[in-house]
């Protein structure tokens, strides 16, 4: 919001689809962490620990599949609504298509796969360094993950959102923020569980984090929804407030 040339005007569908769906995913995460129903029975369980198995992983994947279906439905509806676009928009679309055809498909896939491998390797180094730093400083691994690792791995998402905001593509900027976080929770939690089960490792132990951190995510999402819902735009003062809430959560996380 701070990088946008004007107040960010947001489509109603983005607010009601992406924002609320992310809120629902975070609430489900909190429920899954809090209720023993989602924990797989094991012998000699560790205290304050949940054990997640196939059921939780499939539920998270199902949530993401539903979200992708909603995105696909919105995309098809958008195409139908844009069939009667004027000549100027058609010319702009043609120019964009010509620009995309500059690179061949194999070259594009090469860049995508290469960047994914690069970011994956960089993320691995970031995680190991952050955990080591937390051990040296006596900071809980959950806090390091919530603050340092989350911020570091979100840099690409932030760059994409900033670029979209500068271009006036506000819906894309907001959807990228919520969509990436939905992916992180639904897929990045479920796939390691499935991989561990496939390798015969049994249920994945989840040491219950500070519930206050999850609660802070819900509170921040509700504030964002209130701002987006009020006139369906995000002003610079509101952006400053959201940024302040983030720094407040970071500071408070060290006291939980």
Segments the model singles out, each with a brief description of its role:
Residues 1-256:
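Hydrophobic alpha-helical segments, chiefly the membrane-spanning helices
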